[in-house]
Each structure stands twice: as C-alpha cells, then as structure tokens.
Amino acid sequence: MIIINKSRYLKYKKLKFRCALGKGGIKIKKREGDNITPKGSYKIVKVYYRKDRIKKISTRITCNNIKRDMGWCDDPKSKKYNKLIKLPTQYNHEKLYRKDNIYDLILVLN
C-alpha cells in the first residue's frame, strides 16, 4: 500500500513533481513487501499514463495507456508481485484507473 507524502518530490533538472512513496519511507536497505521505497539511482523502463488526463507525453520510453481493467499486484506471496495484472484478480492489488490522480502517471523503474 502506498501514500502520498506532501513533503516528497521527484526532481528532474529544474522540474519538481509530487510523488507517492511506500508507507515505510525511503531507505537503502529494503526487502520485498516491506512498504519501503528503495533509495538509489534507477532507470525508467516503462511509462503508464491516463490518456484522458494527460494529453501528450514526449519520450523515447515505451508509454502505455492505463485502462479500467489494469492493476498492480502488491501481494508479496504472489508470482505476479510488483507486476502489471489484469482485473479482476484473486491477488491483492492496487487499481490503476482511479477517480483520484495518484496513478495518472506511473514510472516503472529497473
């Protein structure tokens, strides 16, 4: 499960974006399912976004539209943990298509 922490931001050059982090905060040491956002440098490998809310993304990274039947598995006991899944599902998950804007833009890291 994640929360939005208003004092946490993603920074890129002069740009600054509010972002969602794990409930346990940011730490160097982490293990799967601990609700910690790992500290480090990572490469963005894929982008998911709400096409109805974000009109255009200009990047060389693969971009995918978030659809109503998309979820993200957050069940550490599942083989699908931390992966995109199709809803409905038996696994614990986060719905990606939501009324709020927490998942309007998702950056998948390596």
Task: Walk through the language-model features, giving the residues of each.
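Cell wall/extracellular polymer interaction/catalysis modules
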Residues: 1-110
